[in-house]
């Protein structure tokens, strides 16, 4: 019987995507996230300031490796890669542990994390192996969580989806920066966007996004490519959405302003509480006006507008 190894990494919440991506690059066959925030409150409303809730500052990233992989080498490589990034972000004190799993335990462990989840009024995320019958008006996003990048239920993704549902009216061009799983591109298509261009610096993410897009019929209007933020992009967009780290978002805002059409939107998420002011100042310096600010626990998301009429600005 084939066995698997479960490698658990405890890290500060802000490092979730970074550590997940590193583990996949180091050969993980899948990654699961345990976050206390995932179990707090399932009813969210666009534009509402969410109350602070009791939560842990750390999350657990669990990676799965076949027994043919020497996880001690993975641990050493992970530590080395992260040590190169300590000037970029504080991931806290890394805690790493491993456990052996039988094949059937691997399958069960995967599936216990993932169930169909209604995220917004219209959008429901469904694991690819699940038979799910949509109700009238319900739009289904099929994802394979076994390819990592989360299930689409993380607060940063949920707020991004709420924002897309609010601003998309049909016929728009959307740029999805740091696409990851491709969930925001798929949602944009379901919500009526005419054409979506998805970019990610990580070749693994580009592949994962394309595979997830292919799980959903009628997604021929999504184009996925490797790209460093919006460098070299010359496509005018009605909406730009980016769910990535705050330290990276601030390098996006000038190019976003250049590419967003008048009265268009910039949606940003993935912003940890302590870095909200930095991101807001960057967007406003580029010329955007804040329309909506969302908060869920430690995480912030926002909708900025490129407009000359600021009379309807809500502020944060």
From Swiss-Prot:
Subcellular location as annotated: Cytoplasm
EC main group: transferase
Entry GO MF terms: protein-lysine N-methyltransferase activity
Keyword set includes Transport: no
Cellular-component GO terms for this entry: cytoplasm
EC number per UniProt: 2.1.1.-
Record-linked SUPFAM superfamilies: S-adenosyl-L-methionine-dependent methyltransferases
Gene Ontology BP annotations: methylation
Reactions this protein catalyses: L-lysyl-[protein] + 3 S-adenosyl-L-methionine = N(6),N(6),N(6)-trimethyl-L-lysyl-[protein] + 3 S-adenosyl-L-homocysteine + 3 H(+)
Residues annotated to bind S-adenosyl-L-methionine: 157, 178, 200, 243
Superkingdom of the organism of origin: Bacteria
Known role: Methylates ribosomal protein L11.
HAMAP family noted in UniProt: Methyltr_PrmA (MF_00735)
Name the record gives this protein: Ribosomal protein L11 methyltransferase
Organism per entry: Streptococcus pneumoniae (strain CGSP14)
């Amino acid at each position: 019987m084939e066995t698997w190894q479960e490698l658990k990494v405890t890290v500060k919440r802000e490092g979730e995507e970074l550590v997940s991506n590193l583990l996949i690059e180091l050969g993980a066959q899948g990654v699961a996230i345990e976050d206390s925030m995932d179990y707090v409150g399932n009813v969210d409303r666009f534009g509402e300031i969410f109350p602070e809730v009791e939560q842990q500052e750390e999350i657990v990233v669990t990676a799965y490796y076949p027994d043919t992989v020497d996880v001690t080498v993975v641990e050493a490589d992970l530590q080395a890669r992260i040590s190169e990034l300590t000037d970029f972000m504080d991931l806290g004190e890394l805690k790493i542990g491993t456990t052996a799993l039988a094949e059937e335990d691997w399958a069960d462990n995967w599936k216990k994390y993932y169930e169909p989840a209604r995220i917004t009024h219209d959008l429901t995320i469904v694991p690819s192996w699940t038979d799910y019958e949509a109700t009238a008006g319900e739009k289904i996003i099929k994802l394979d969580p076994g390819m990592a990048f989360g299930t689409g239920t993380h607060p940063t993704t949920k707020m991004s989806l709420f924002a897309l549902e609010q601003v998309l009216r049909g016929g728009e061009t959307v740029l999805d920066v740091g696409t990851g799983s491709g969930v925001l591109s798929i949602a944009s298509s379901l919500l009526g966007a005419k054409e979506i261009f998805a970019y990610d610096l990580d070749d693994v993410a580009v592949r994962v996004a394309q595979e997830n897009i292919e799980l959903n019929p009628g997604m021929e209007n999504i184009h996925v490519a490797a790209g460093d933020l919006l460098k070299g992009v010359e496509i005018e967009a009605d909406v730009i959405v980016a769910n990535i780290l705050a330290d990276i978002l601030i390098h996006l805002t000038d190019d976003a302003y250049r590419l967003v059409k008048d009265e268009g939107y910039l949606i940003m998420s993935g912003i940890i509480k302590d870095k909200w002011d930095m991101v807001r100042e960057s967007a406003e310096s580029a010329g955007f006006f804040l329309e909506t600010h969302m908060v869920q626990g430690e995480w912030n998301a926002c909708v900025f507008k490129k407009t000359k009429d600021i009379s309807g600005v809500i502020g944060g």
